[in-house]
Amino acid sequence: RAVGGGSLELAKALKEGEQASQAQLLGRLYQDLEQLEREIALRAESLQAVTEYLSRQKDRLVATPALWPTEGYVSSRFGPRTSPFTGQPQHHTGVDIAAPPGTPIRAPADGVVTFAGTLPGYGHALVLTHGYGFKTFYGHNQRNQVSKGQTVKRGQVIALVGNTGYSTGAHLHYEVLLNDQPHDPLKYVVDEGQRPKL
């Protein structure tokens, strides 16, 4: 009988130990699952942050005026030069691209036409706003092909090269502005095959 009673006690102790081990195992499993859930949430946040960053970079790239706007050669570069009208030194805020009258001018990036009209000195002119602080300006156009408020896509024809305003021959006066400050347009052309003749 002592043997039988001991066996029952041993069986009971083993069963309690097994239940305790199962409870510990379930407790550890629960903790591991909670930790895994926290890690998944952190990774999801990181993935979301990376996705948002890449989306912003893509939008910025689409807004960057990286396409050369017309065929021709650069007849006057950005920076210091002598004015063709006064003979005095001046800062040229863009580049002049000499081309035959009627040569298509294309949008260098997606954007919205924020000015389409006539300006003193520049004749028929356009301003495109691209986002991320970028704007581009086109002067001496023969004819504007787009209207104020119109959305344009990179590569779309927006005007034709002309000789309007104060001009010594058919050309496009092209400016790139970042936060309303003029920058050398040549610095934004990313396709080497697109680089203009200098």
Language-model-detected regions and their locations in the chain:
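Catalytic cores of peptidoglycan-degrading enzymes
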Residues: 66-198
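Non-catalytic extracellular/periplasmic "stalk"
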Residues: 1-77
